[in-house]
Regions:
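Low-complexity, flexible helical/coil segments
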Residues: 2, 6-7, 11, 53, ...
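Signature for the C-terminal beta-barrel architecture of outer-membrane proteins
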Residues: 54-59, 77-256
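Surface-exposed loop and membrane-interface regions of Gram-negative outer-membrane beta-barrel proteins
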Residues: 1, 7-56, 68-76, 121-125, ...
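Short, solvent-exposed loop/turn segments at secondary-structure junctions
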Residues: 21-24, 66, 108, 249
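C-terminal structural cap/anchor segments
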Residues: 240-282
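Small/polar (Gly/Ser/Thr/Ala-rich) solvent-exposed segments
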Residues: 62
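Short, Lys/Arg-enriched charge-dense amphipathic segments
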Residues: 37-44, 81-87, 97-101, 181, ...
Length: 282
């Protein structure tokens, strides 16, 4: 993978242009490679970020990548060989106390080509976005909502609340809408102390699909996700930390095919706690 990321800052404006060439070599014809591994020379970011009055309030326009919160729903992958990019706008405001709100209105960029033969051959095709796939969101962060109020452990509490909306249309999906509402709270690790993270997410939506025989089916989407982590960091030079984790994500019930219950990770990373899982096809 070869990546070039250039930025230029002038008078409250930040121009950014990033290109990347991600290829494969020596893969077998029956390999599991896809657009998550290969994306021949393409533009990942081409944006301008404007300061609106001050750097505490900004507006980003163009193509960009982003990380939000735990990165479970929106992320710029670290281990995966290709990125998630969006065409649109991102508005961010940070208050003097550190509280932040971000609003985005985008069209997710589809990595092309998608067919396996082209991926294995490292074929080139411009990535593109479409009005048939739209992604919106609002994300709020409170870095220390209880600072100075508890006089102890929970002064370090950090909370997040957010809502995302994904709408899609295609040849087989006449209309699909998924709303994602989530809350997250954490106390980050420090030597000699316990830490924790808890996140809960609800998804609700509906879809209309066109079957191969021309029939139209309608169903709803109802999914949930929950995460809990409790850890302890020892006050030793090695920074030893032990932790207990629970992950839960709903799945489809084969008895009710008209209802989609599999949790949709949107544009997040998969099992990032375990490193480069893409090596194993996870």
């Amino acid at each position: 993978r070869t990546r070039i990321d250039a930025r230029y800052k002038e008078n409250g404006r930040v121009w950014q242009f990033e290109v990347m060439d991600a290829r494969q070599q020596l893969a077998d014809a029956d390999g599991i490679l896809g657009t998550g591994d290969v994306n021949a020379l393409d533009i990942q970011q081409a944006s301008v970020k404007l300061a609106l009055g001050s750097e505490a309030t900004t507006l980003k326009l163009g193509r960009f990548t982003s990380d939000y919160g735990s990165r479970r729903l929106v992320a710029r992958p670290i281990y995966r060989n290709t990125f998630n990019a969006f065409d649109g706008l991102e508005f961010t405001h940070t208050a003097p106390n550190g509280n932040q709100v971000a609003v985005l209105a985008t069209q997710p960029v589809q990595r092309l080509p998608t067919d396996k033969a082209s991926v294995l051959d490292n074929d080139f095709e411009w990535d593109k976005s479409s009005n048939n796939r739209r992604f919106y969101g609002i994300f709020t962060t409170q870095p220390a909502p209880l600072a100075g109020k508890t006089g102890g452990y929970f002064d370090r509490l950090r909370t997040e609340a957010y809502y995302f909306s994904l709408r899609e249309k295609s040849d087989t999906i006449l209309d699909s809408s998924i709303g994602t509402l989530g809350l997250r709270a954490e106390v980050r690790a420090q030597p000699g102390q316990f830490d924790f993270e808890v996140e809960g997410i609800l998804q609700r939506g509906d879809n209309t699909r066109l079957a191969a025989d021309g029939s139209v089916s309608r169903g709803d989407h109802r999914a949930e996700y929950a995460f809990f982590e409790l850890g302890y960091s020892f006050a030793v030079p090695s920074r030893l930390r032990v932790l207990f984790e629970i992950d839960y994500g709903s799945g489809n019930d084969l008895g009710t095919p008209q209802r989609q219950e599999r949790f949709n990770q949107l544009f997040g990373v998969t099992a990032f706690a375990y490193g480069p899982t893409g090596f194993y096809g996870v």
